[in-house]
């Protein structure tokens, strides 16, 4: 009898109740917009960043403008640059924003069946702009942004915060991510993770992911519930 009770308890603890979504490059095709906004802001301040540099520094490593300036020995004002970039990015969202393939259908499929959280390292205004533009804010019980935690990805803080606010154990969650920094963060948080690479992240190291899928269209309830 005790063995049956223990087995039932372990099944419940491991049951997937909650899905934690990344935003940029996973649900929304916004990495190109972030890149364009940084390029325009830096150009206006007499500097330049290539697409490849942006992909490596921001998307892969999760570093920010302050580190980028410091590494190059520049004397630019990171606060002014970030403000310029933010204004331009929000402008671009109004005209260029689009969802990633399969994103809206997946959210609709999971909405009434799992608890959903959004965990994005971006600033709140950028997150709110994307959610409003795509009309998807109502899908999420919990939204955690980069200003809500001490350290952003690849640190695990943002996923741990999302799980805690959902009232779920790490073993009951699955993270959906498109970038190496997010995969590392999920791994450090002890949460299973499915990687869905995009154009900017196909060359990333996804060896820590529980599974790799080519598109959000491959994510199903059956896949989530049977993920080992």
Where in this protein do the model-derived segments appear?
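Asp-based, Mg2+/Mn2+-dependent phosphohydrolase catalytic module
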Residues: 4-17, 124-228
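N-terminal helical cap/lid subdomain that shapes the substrate entry/recognition surface
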Residues: 14-105, 111-112
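Conserved SAM-binding loop
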Residues: 27, 99, 116-119, 151, ...
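Residue-level detector of anion-binding/catalytic polar loops
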Residues: 48, 115-116, 192
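Short, flexible loop segments at the rims of nucleotide/cofactor-binding pockets, characterized by
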Residues: 92-97, 121, 189-190
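Substrate-recognition element of Asp-dependent hydrolases with the DxDx(T/V) motif
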Residues: 103-131, 186
